C-alpha cells in the first residue's frame, strides 16, 4: 500500500511540473514573437545634407548624394504648402520657407478638411513650403531609402527644435549625425500635397502625432510591465 502511495505521489509531482512549465513555455514563445515583430523596425541616420552624410561615411559619398537628392524631391512633393509666405513663416520661422517648385499636376483643389483651404488654381511657384532641414537615411546596404525632415524656429510651434516628417511625426531633437530606430512605415513614401494648408494647420498635425506617439509609448510600457508580472 505504501509503495502504491509513493508511485501516485511521483505521478502527481510530474503532472504538476508539466502544468507549471506550460506558462513558462508560452512566455518564451511570446518573447520570440515580439522579437520577430521588432524586425519591422529600421535603423536610420539623420543628416543635414549630402556633405554631412559623406563626412560620416567617406566611402559612400555617391549613396549619400543620391539619398539627399531623393529626399529633396520628396520634400518638394510632400511638404505642407501655404498660399502665402506669411502663413509659412508663422509656422516655421524666418528664413525657413521657400517658394514651392513647379510640379506636374500640382494644382490646388478644394478640400472639406478643416486644416486645408479651398484654393483656386495657382501658377507654378506661387505656393510656399518649409525648407528641408535634414533627411533620414536608411542603411546603405538596403538601398539607402530616405525621407525629408523639417523643423520650425517659430517659438510657439510644436515642431520648434524638433525633426518632423511631412505628416507631422516627431523624430526628436533637430540634431544631425545621430542614429535611431524607427518603424519601417516611417520610410514609406508619403502622399503628394496638392492643397494649401491654413496657418497653424501643420502645427496641429504635429501636436496630434506627438500625442499619439506618447500614448503608444505608454501602452507599450504598460504591456511590458504586465508581461513581467
From Swiss-Prot:
**Coiled-coil spans in chain:** none
Q: What are the start and end residues of every segment in region (Disordered)?
A: 101-125, 190-229
Q: Which InterPro entries does the record cross-reference, listed alphabetically?
A: Biofilm_formation_YgiB (IPR009576)
Biased composition range(s): Low complexity? 109-120, 214-229
- Top-level taxon: Bacteria
**HAMAP family from the xrefs?**
UPF0441
| Record-stated family | Belongs to the UPF0441 family.
Protein name, please? UPF0441 protein YE3666
Its lineage reads: Bacteria, Pseudomonadati, Pseudomonadota, Gammaproteobacteria, Enterobacterales
Amino acid at each position: 500500500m505504501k509503495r502504491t502511495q509513493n508511485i501516485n505521489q511521483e505521478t502527481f509531482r510530474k503532472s504538476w511540473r508539466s502544468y507549471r512549465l506550460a506558462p513558462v513555455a508560452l512566455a518564451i514563445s511570446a518573447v520570440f514573437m515580439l522579437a520577430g515583430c521588432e524586425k519591422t523596425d529600421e535603423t536610420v541616420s539623420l543628416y543635414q545634407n549630402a556633405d554631412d552624410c559623406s563626412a560620416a561615411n567617406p566611402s559612400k559619398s555617391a549613396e549619400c548624394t543620391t539619398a539627399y537628392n531623393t529626399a529633396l524631391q520628396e520634400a518638394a512633393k510632400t511638404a505642407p504648402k501655404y498660399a502665402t509666405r506669411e502663413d509659412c513663416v508663422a509656422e516655421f520661422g524666418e528664413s525657413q520657407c521657400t517658394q514651392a517648385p513647379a510640379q506636374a499636376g500640382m494644382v490646388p483643389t478644394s478640400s472639406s478638411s478643416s486644416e486645408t483651404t479651398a484654393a483656386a488654381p495657382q501658377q507654378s511657384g506661387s505656393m510656399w513650403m518649409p525648407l528641408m532641414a535634414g533627411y533620414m537615411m536608411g542603411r546603405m546596404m538596403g538601398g539607402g531609402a530616405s525621407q525629408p525632415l523639417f523643423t520650425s524656429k517659430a517659438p510657439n510651434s510644436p515642431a520648434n527644435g524638433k525633426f518632423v516628417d511631412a505628416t507631422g511625426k516627431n523624430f526628436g531633437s533637430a540634431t544631425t549625425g545621430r542614429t535611431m530606430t524607427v518603424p519601417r512605415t516611417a520610410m514609406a513614401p508619403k502622399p503628394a500635397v496638392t492643397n494649401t494648408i491654413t496657418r497653424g494647420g501643420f502645427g496641429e498635425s504635429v501636436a496630434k502625432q506627438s500625442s499619439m506617439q506618447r500614448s503608444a509609448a505608454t501602452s507599450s510600457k504598460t504591456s511590458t510591465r504586465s508581461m513581467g508580472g
